[in-house]
Amino acid sequence: MKQYRKQLQIRWADLDPNGHIRHSVYYDWGAYSRIAFLTENGLSPSRMMELQVGPVIFREECVFKKEIRLEDTLYIDLELLQARRDFSRWTMQHLLYKESGTLAAVLTLNGAWMDTIKRKLTVPPELVFDAYEVMPKSADFEWMD
């Protein structure tokens, strides 16, 4: 897959007192993008529950580059930056763009897959592997060996 992009809906409730997007909304948008991608590739939250696995995040960071306001049209991309070959651990990146093409924010996160019964990190099942295999890779993607 070359690119995964979603248009975002900016709501009044997403604004802070300064009239721009509240910092925590960026993280919500990232989660929305990731779950949408996984669902569209056969790995819905209910399917994860059936498989008894779920993603866990170790670190999540947002770099704010341009102000985003209510009237802006905004898009979010999803890319895989790094991964183990079994996709048990990974680093993803979300790029948030204004309609003009201006990069507004970069959200980066490190995570893994957890067995939701044992509550331990695990190698994910084949369905997870299949979804990650088609996830767009960044230009500088590298395997974590």
Explain the meaning of each model-derived region:
Residues K6, I68-T73, L81-D145:
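HotDog/MaoC-like acyl-thioester-processing domains
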